[in-house]
C-alpha cells in the first residue's frame, strides 16, 4: 500500500476531502488528511482565500511541515488547489517522497524556487496532474507544461489529465462545480497511480 498525505483547498477540510480519503483507504492505501485551517470550512472560494491570506503562505507551509513531521519518508503527497502547492513543495523537498498527485492545477519548478527555494525536481519522482480544460485558475502552458518538462527531465513519469468544462473544484461533491463523471474518472486514475507506486 502507498501512504498518502492529502492537503485540502482553501475551502478547508470539508466532507469531500474526507470522503476522498476514505475512497483511497478502501483501495488499500493509508491516508492522512491534515487540517491546515483550525477546523474552519468555507462555502465559497473568496471566503477560503480570505482565510488563506490571513494565515499567510509561510504559516501554512509551517503547518504542512508540522503535519508530516512524524510520518515516514516514503510518502505520496496530494493536494486540492491551494493544497497542491504544498503537496508539490513537500514532494520536491522532503527526502524519500515517492510521488505527487496535483488536483486542479500545478506549479512550475520556478515557482517552487521563488517561494520555497526548491531548485530542481527530484530524480525519479512521478507526478500526476488533473484539471478542467477551461479552468480560469489554471494556466496550463505556464504551469503544467513546464512542470512536466522538469519531471520528465528528472527521469520520472508525468501524467496530465484534462477534463471537460471550467469547474475548478470539480471533484468536491458538496461544491457547485462538482462534475460526477470527471470526478469518478479522476479517482480511478489516482488509485491506479498509487497502485503503480506501491508496486515499485
Name each model feature, range by range.
Residues 77-79, 103:
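Short beta-strand immediately N-terminal to the catalytic nucleophile in serine-hydrolase-like folds
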Residues 79-83, 87:
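Gly/Ala-rich beta-loop-alpha elbow adjacent to hydrolase catalytic centers
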Residues 96-108, 126:
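A conserved short beta-strand
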Residues 157-200:
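C-terminal catalytic histidine-bearing segment of alpha/beta-hydrolase fold enzymes
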Residues 136-143:
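Conserved alpha/beta-hydrolase "acid-adjacent" motif
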Residues 1-74, 171:
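Serine-hydrolase catalytic machinery in alpha/beta-hydrolase-like enzymes
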Residues 19, 89-93:
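Active-site signature of alpha/beta-hydrolase-fold catalytic machinery across serine-
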Amino acid at each position: 500500500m502507498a501512504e498518502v498525505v492529502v492537503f485540502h483547498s482553501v475551502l478547508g477540510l470539508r466532507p469531500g476531502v474526507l470522503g476522498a480519503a476514505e475512497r483511497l483507504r478502501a483501495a488499500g492505501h493509508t491516508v492522512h488528511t491534515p487540517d491546515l485551517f483550525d477546523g474552519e470550512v468555507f462555502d465559497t472560494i473568496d471566503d477560503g482565500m480570505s482565510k488563506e491570506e490571513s494565515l499567510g503562505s509561510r504559516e501554512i507551509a509551517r503547518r504542512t511541515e508540522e503535519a508530516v513531521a512524524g510520518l515516514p519518508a516514503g510518502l505520496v503527497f496530494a493536494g486540492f488547489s491551494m493544497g497542491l502547492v504544498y503537496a508539490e513543495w513537500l514532494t520536491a523537498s522532503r527526502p524519500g517522497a515517492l510521488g505527487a498527485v496535483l488536483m486542479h492545477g500545478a506549479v512550475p519548478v520556478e515557482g517552487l524556487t521563488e517561494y520555497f527555494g526548491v531548485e530542481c525536481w527530484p530524480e525519479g519522482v512521478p507526478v500526476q496532474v488533473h484539471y478542467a480544460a477551461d479552468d480560469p485558475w489554471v494556466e496550463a502552458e505556464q504551469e503544467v507544461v513546464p512542470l512536466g518538462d522538469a519531471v520528465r527531465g528528472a527521469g520520472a513519469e508525468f501524467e496530465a489529465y484534462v477534463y471537460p468544462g471550467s469547474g475548478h473544484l470539480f471533484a468536491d461533491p458538496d461544491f457547485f462545480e462538482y462534475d460526477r463523471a470527471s470526478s469518478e474518472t479522476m479517482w480511478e486514475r489516482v488509485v491506479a497511480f498509487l497502485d503503480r507506486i506501491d508496486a515499485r
